[in-house]
Amino acid sequence: MEQEKHVFSIDWAGRPLTVEIGELAKQANGAVLVRYGDTVVLSTATASKEPKSVDFFPLTVNYEERLYAVGKIPGGFIKREGRPSEKAILASRLIDRPIRPLFAEGFRNEVQVVSMVMSVDQDCSPEMAAMFGSSLALTISDIPFEGPIAGVTVGRVDGKFVINPSVAQMEQSDMHLVVAGTKDAINMVEAGANEVPEEVMLEAIMFGHEEIKRLIAFQEDIAAKVGKEKMEVVLYELNAELEAEIRARVEGEVKRAVQVPEKLAREAAIEQLKAEVVAAYEEQEADEETLKQVKEILYKLVKEEVRRLITEEKVRPDGRKVDEIRPLSSAVGLLPRTHGSGLFTRGQTQALSVCTLGALGDVQILDGLGIEETKRFMHHYNFPPFSVGETGAMRGPGRREIGHGALGERALEPVIPSEKEFPYTIRLVSEVLESNGSTSQASICASTLAMMDAGVPIKAPVAGIAMGLVKSGEHYTILTDIQGMEDHLGDMDFKVAGTEKGVTALQMDIKIKGLSREILEEALQQARKGRLEILKHMMQTISEPRKELSPYAPKILTMQINPDKIRDVIGPSGKQINKIIEETGVKIDIEQDGTIFISSVNEEMNKKAKKIIEDIVREVEVGQVYLGKVKRIEKFGAFVELFSGKDGLVHISELAEERVGKVEDVVSIGDEILVKVTEIDKQGRVNLSRKAVLRDQKEAEQ
């Protein structure tokens, strides 16, 4: 039966937002076509009919970029889209995080949300359209989603907040905030900012929430008209009798195991307790389902005890106070041949960051759905399995590693010197060597140290800290510097990075349905206190960037030429510039305004390359005398090289004061002679005279 097409419209930040339902992808549980300006995104939500036998909620969110959306054909031999770009992976995570908490506890049906970007208007964010579409597709479907949610981008231009700023406005904005939530509360924040005070960030979040409420009302109105009845699902539940039996048996032992201060010893104590209880039920010949439930009940008891300790006794598993940071240590200059290195350790979390400086030609070229651009600052994050004492495959970066690397990049970018101040490409790599929570924030601290060790003149040091939350009813406890167990068993992971002056990055994920303004405000202020403490420690390790770069870092020499001369330096098909590079071993980057960056480890070679370029662009002046070298002899005269790339002709009649029969009677190839420029004709040919120089010398002697 043909389904009726429904169209709904609203204004969103001064641009039309139109939703079409019932025409496309009708076999999905829910499907919507979102048109935002000229951006078009198809969002679908699909669920399995039966629950999966797993101990987690199997949700997958995909943000699919199609290059036809911006009128491009993919590069390479295959000519089709390959692996998702970093931007697509980050967008998938951005959509996943606010919708994941809004499914019932025990829901185990597989859910897949796919957003296909089909057309892109650069001023109408496809990510925000996809987030809206994903929520609406779930809301109108028969999947038991407890939304809707919505998300907006907030910028601040000239002190005023702007919803979904255009590309031009974003260039002027001192923050880039993505906030998502339900109509009652915020449940996801992702932000980069130029050292913005905590109070301003909070106001921006709440400003965004007002727009979110309007978008949710729009979704609820659509769902009331075209939404399907929600499917009946069986929620996974623990056996109450078995739970009571195990609770009575091991409650005291769980309390003791949870309070073992050291991570590995605590994990070993919990594992031993689990093994003993499972063994006891195996002896009773319990079936597989019962043994699975035994393990899940023990996990639940551990979670309850950790949360009880924090909320009731204000005691954490490792014995710290709720606002106490783990012991800190740091060092710089660990790797002699690298350009800069920094080690940062916080409790059992440790990150080693390495800074590498390159020429401007080493920038990363970004060619996706956005405007083509380059990136001269990169921050990469690696999380090897040995960091948690496990074995595992060493593959390329996963979604989590890409997300953590991007968060560090966002946190550090506001303090990176401009290209004019520091004409280098900067790459940071953070290797997580030990992990017990907050590794992304440790990598930010280690990367700050590595840049200072490398001599990068950053505007201010940046530190990061992760805040946690345990909420029970109306009572809540905010934790400073959460460790792995608190992250895993708590309700919030709120990462805050910044300088002494203000915030440079925020990232908030929660497992509950939302957070109030009061909790956000308290978490931001508690994070500031912790951040300042960490910055103070880092400044004791290295108080300012080193004045000298590493001897192994490239030296960069900058020069300015007339932009009209750029083609002379490059030469036909790059022949001239390649000759200079071959002769000197340097890298040469030329800007459109005539700025040239020459880089190599050898300063003498930089100077040599500069001299060659100066000679190429040097202008020959009429009336000037030059010491040139005879390069070629013809019957009618001699061709003399004045300097690299500039020749002129001394006609036979201009070689001497007396009559010359043969050119070879006066000069030979290789001779150095003084010549005067007498004329530059319309074709740019240079005429020289040796006779004029001889005459001038005679007159001077008289």
From Swiss-Prot:
For this UniProt entry, the molecular function terms from Gene Ontology, in alphabetical order, are:
3'-5'-RNA exonuclease activity; magnesium ion binding; polyribonucleotide nucleotidyltransferase activity; RNA binding
- CC cofactor: Mg(2+)
* Classification via Gene3D superfamilies: GHMP Kinase, N-terminal domain, K Homology domain, type 1, Nucleic acid-binding proteins
Q: Which UniProt keywords apply?
A: Cytoplasm, Magnesium, Metal-binding, Nucleotidyltransferase, RNA-binding, Transferase
Q: Extract the coiled-coil ranges from the record.
A: none
GO terms of biological process kind: mRNA catabolic process; RNA processing
Which reaction does this enzyme catalyse, per its entry?
Answer: RNA(n+1) + phosphate = RNA(n) + a ribonucleoside 5'-diphosphate
| Compartment annotation | Cytoplasm
Q: Which residues bind Mg(2+)?
A: 487, 493
Which residues does the UniProt record annotate as the domain KH? Answer: 554-613
**Does the entry annotate any disulfide bonds, and if so which pairs?**
none
- Record domain S1 motif: where: 623-691
The EC number of this protein is: 2.7.7.8
Domain of life the protein comes from: Bacteria
Gene Ontology cellular component annotations, sorted alphabetically: cytosol
* Main localization, broad class: cytoplasm
Which InterPro entries does the UniProt entry name for this protein?
ExoRNase_PH_dom1, ExoRNase_PH_dom2, ExoRNase_PH_dom2_sf, KH_dom, KH_dom_type_1, KH_dom_type_1_sf, NA-bd_OB-fold, PNPase
What's this protein's function?
Answer: Involved in mRNA degradation. Catalyzes the phosphorolysis of single-stranded polyribonucleotides processively in the 3'- to 5'-direction.
Similarity annotation: Belongs to the polyribonucleotide nucleotidyltransferase family.
User: How is this protein named in the record?
Assistant: Polyribonucleotide nucleotidyltransferase
Organism name: Anoxybacillus flavithermus (strain DSM 21510 / WK1)
